[in-house]
Amino acid sequence: AMEMLKNIEEELKKEYNVKRAPFGWYKAFKLSCKGHPLAELSRQIECKKEEEKEEVVSNWYILTPEGELIEAEKFDFKGYEGLKKFYEYEAFGSRKVEKEPAHIKLMKEHELVDYESGSDYGNMRWYPKGYLIKRLLEEKVEEICLNAGAMEVETPIMYDVNHPALSKYLKKFPARQYRVKADKGKEFFLRFAACFGQYLMAKDMTISYKNLPIRLFELAKSFRREQHGEVTGIKRLRAFTMPDMHTICRDEKQALEEFKKQYLLSLEWAKILEIDGEIAMRFVKDFFEKHRDYVVDLVKKWGKPVLVEIWDKRYFYFVMKFEINMNDSVGKAFALSTVQIDVENPKSFDITYIDEDGKEKYPYLLHASISGGIDRCVCALLEKEAMKIKNGQKGSYPFWLAPTQVRLIPVSHEFVNDCLELAKKIKARIDIDDRDESVSRKIRDAEREWVPIIIVYGEKEKNEGKFKPRYRFECSDKEVTVEKLNEIIEEKMQGFPFRKIPLPILLSKRPKFR
């Protein structure tokens, strides 16, 4: 062995600079390449024939309320700049985040929501004011769905990856899952929608045609391992709250009836959020041609042109889908409300009903989120206000969502107790700025927080029982009594849920969250 080693050394020296060092009998070395099986860069490589992937081919159109279907490239977008931006993003844009959207700065400045370094990317911490807004939105959409006849349920957040029906579904979305190990080596995935639990519940139900339509609703905490480069602020998250409703329908006719009802509820939600969005409708070609008049009627309800995507054949589980989308401050779009007609999953999950003839049949299934993700709704509100601010306007919250609806500013400490008594008479989320700051500074701070009603309180207000509020909305009442102020507040709050302020009433008692 030594002779062979020397010969190798001599041969190598002809072309290379070689050094040979003594190595004792009791020494050894080992080369190894180690990687944790769960490490992001680890791979299991299998030799198998590459499967041919079917390319999804679609065509883009603009459909007007008058029923004209025009190729998107030939449509005159004059007066519809928002629709143009949305089309260009959908057809040619990238979801990768290149510039930080404006809502991120606002959500931090207003102490609403923030990143959590102790968790995975896209899992957020919600501060009291942000959580208040989030819960109010959840309560409102819950009310809308229950009033529409939905039955509220709760289903597990994790499911067996080897479940016969679920495993096929998972293969379509392999990268989106969080996996969890449990007892006896069983593996589960965290749900990325409420679909799984509601499918399995529907499968075990005994359903007659007389029971249909059946609407199942859940305010679902869901998890999706979105690509890191696409996760940004509260627009696209890995953990989010999605109000999910599934409607089991007897046939296509009933599915279209329910679709229209839920479409109109979605339009109502856009008005509630006070957002000017853009609608996308997506169809399989045959389905669109069969129901074109029905679709045009939906567009008329919206009142302006919509973007239409048409596939020659069905690539997905749905034959018709609609979304309300919003363009953000950096030229990206994101979806809020959505309704879909599903013709595949009832069969995949063996969801059946007994028809009038006594036979088991597969129903049509509607997927709907009347609001879209709640986190995204907060994002939409902030993005809308950011664009207003950029155009020189004042930012504001819808009155029912403002963390502080009325702020009392005593001119000195001697009026703090009077303000505390006054606060008991005002029917709103109210706080008192008792800090050692000037009145002008307190007014500026209240305006920075978008407080919709600001009242400075001193000797004159105490003696006369009247106030001159600063409004962040149009109001002709320049001087009001407590009674009149409550009338104004009641009118602004009509039809909306209310929660008490989640912070100490005195600003001097509040901690800073960032």
Where do the model's predicted regions map?
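Metal-assisted phosphate- and nucleotidyl-transfer catalytic regions
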Residues: 268-335, 339, 512-514
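Conserved short loop/turn motifs at secondary-structure junctions
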Residues: 125-132, 158-163, 279-288, 310-314, ...
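Auxiliary tRNA-acceptor-end handling modules of aminoacyl-tRNA synthetases
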Residues: 31, 44-221, 225-226, 231, ...
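Generic long, charged, amphipathic alpha-helical segments
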Residues: 391-444
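Conserved, charged catalytic cores of large soluble enzymes
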Residues: 271-294, 395-418, 479
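Conserved alpha/beta core surface patches that mediate binding of polyanionic ligands
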Residues: 85-109, 192-264, 318, 328-349, ...
